[in-house]
């Protein structure tokens, strides 16, 4: 079913890869409820909804597309929903109405995924931009690891600066990073997961990891279904004029997922002649998960860049994603345990930093000799970590690419879809 021999992998390797991916991204089941609480959504509601959406999307990715990519509600759009859509409306838009907008975007997303458009879009992206996306995601994910661990910290004059290297959390991260790097240098199977497990044990014995709330609890949805009638959802969007909100959800989700899929697939060696096999099935995963998640009460889902950690651990097939889905299902009954582990950034940050370094390898495939090819890709690489947004990096690449190509007199090399989305990105960034 998963073609393990064809991908030169094994059940053990895929399970270890799935566990690695899960533990690097499980923070979302705690962080997402905290962020959406600012919109008034009950914590337990979002906790359970986040897991349900993640299971649906990741299972689809595993069984239909056979990709080692996990799906979950994305960071960024959850904050956009909580602060820009709900809180900024001063009571004019409830969180239930906001989820109607998410649901509508999800349905439109499914329709787009069923058409050839998204597949054509992936194939239309110039090779240099594809390599730039992979490299930019690598820098972004490494920066996330450094920031979460406290190795770099916010600074008023320089934006970021070196963190407190005497902090127990930072020291633990550096120890975990050293363990993981040494294991990878020695080509130890499951190096990243072993490094995470070793760091967790050190955290426990040094008093940084506590299980004061126990290990298990029963899941529940205190408000039931957020959207019981899909037709009401569309009506809410029309009544409140949430067209710009739906457009933002749709555009950002499309390119967050597309960018992550390209980056992870490139890293895993799944791209065939710069094309993704089973791409339509893969693209349906996040759109379906977004729609289901909105019904229960969570923000739009996306392909998680932390999937690259599982790929670095050897994940090559949907068995990796299936393992992640099973772990998400189990986490529904172990919220205190999950909360405790995800609260220690030092456990997962080393894996993110190492994966970032591995993804940087794509920079060697880029054409740096032609300015009209190099500069748009450079903007993608630069913008992703500096704006903390994959879609913004892609947007700047898309907007600049037609401009520099036309200036060079190479307008015939510009795919029409690149021009269309360059215009859409310009509208989203500078007008909406």
Curated annotation (Swiss-Prot):
Gene assigned in the entry: pbuO
Source organism phylogeny: Bacteria, Bacillati, Bacillota, Bacilli, Bacillales
Organism: Bacillus subtilis (strain 168)
Listed GO CC annotations: plasma membrane
Cellular localization per UniProt: Cell membrane
Keywords from the UniProt entry: Cell membrane, Membrane, Transmembrane, Transmembrane helix, Transport
Function summary: Involved in the uptake of the purine bases hypoxanthine and guanine. May work at purine concentrations higher than 100 uM.
Coiled-coil region list: none
Induction profile: Expression is regulated by the purR regulon. Down-regulated by adenine and up-regulated by guanosine.
Membrane spanning stretches: 15-35, 51-71, 92-112, 133-153, 174-194, 196-216, 234-254, 340-360, 379-399, 412-432
An annotated Gene Ontology molecular function: purine nucleobase transmembrane transporter activity
Membrane topology of the entry: Multi-pass membrane protein
Pfam families for this protein: Xan_ur_permease (PF00860)
Name of protein: Guanine/hypoxanthine permease PbuO
Family: Belongs to the nucleobase:cation symporter-2 (NCS2) (TC 2.A.40) family. Azg-like subfamily.
Domain of life the protein comes from: Bacteria
């Amino acid at each position: 079913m998963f073609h393990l021999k064809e991908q030169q992998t094994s059940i053990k390797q895929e399970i270890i890869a799935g566990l690695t991916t899960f533990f690097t991204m499980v923070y979302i089941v705690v962080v997402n409820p905290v962020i959406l609480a600012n919109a008034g959504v009950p914590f337990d509601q979002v906790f359970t909804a986040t897991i349900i959406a993640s299971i649906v999307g990741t299972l689809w990715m595993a069984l239909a597309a056979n990709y080692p990519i996990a799906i979950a509600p994305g960071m960024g759009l959850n904050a956009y929903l909580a602060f820009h859509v709900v809180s900024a409306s001063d009571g004019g838009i409830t969180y239930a109405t906001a989820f109607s907008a998410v649901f509508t975007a999800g349905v439109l997303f499914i329709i787009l995924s069923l058409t050839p458009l998204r597949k054509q879009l992936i194939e239309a992206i110039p090779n240099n931009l594809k390599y730039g996306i992979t490299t930019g995601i690598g820098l972004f994910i490494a920066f996330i690891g450094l920031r979460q661990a406290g190795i770099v910290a916010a600074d008023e004059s320089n934006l970021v600066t070196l963190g407190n290297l005497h902090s127990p959390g930072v020291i633990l991260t550096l120890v975990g990073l050293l363990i993981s790097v040494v294991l990878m240098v020695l080509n130890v199977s499951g190096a990243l997961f072993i490094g995470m497990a070793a760091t967790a044990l050190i955290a426990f014995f040094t008093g940084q990891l506590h299980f004061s709330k126990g290990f298990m609890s029963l899941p529940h949805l205190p408000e039931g279904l957020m959207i019981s009638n899909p037709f009401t959802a569309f009506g809410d969007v029309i009544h409140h004029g949430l067209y710009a909100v739906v457009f933002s959800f749709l555009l950002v989700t499309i390119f967050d997922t597309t960018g992550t899929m390209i980056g992870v697939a490139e890293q895993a060696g799944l791209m065939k002649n710069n094309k993704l096999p089973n791409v339509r099935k893969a693209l349906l995963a996040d759109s379906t998960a977004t729609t289901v998640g909105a019904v229960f009460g969570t923000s739009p889902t996306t392909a998680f860049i932390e999937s690259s950690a599982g790929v670095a651990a050897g994940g090559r097939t949907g068995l990796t994603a299936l393992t992640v889905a099973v772990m998400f299902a189990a986490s529904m009954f172990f919220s205190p345990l999950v909360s405790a582990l995800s609260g220690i950034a030092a456990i997962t940050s080393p894996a993110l930093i190492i994966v970032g370094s591995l993804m940087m390898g794509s920079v060697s495939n880029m054409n740096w000799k032609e300015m009209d090819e190099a500069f748009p890709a450079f903007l993608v690489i630069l913008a992703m970590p500096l704006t903390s947004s994959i879609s913004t990096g892609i947007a700047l690449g898309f907007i600049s690419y037609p401009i520099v190509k036309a200036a060079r007199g190479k307008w015939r090399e510009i795919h029409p879809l690149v021009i269309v989305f360059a215009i859409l990105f310009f509208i989203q960034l500078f007008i909406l």
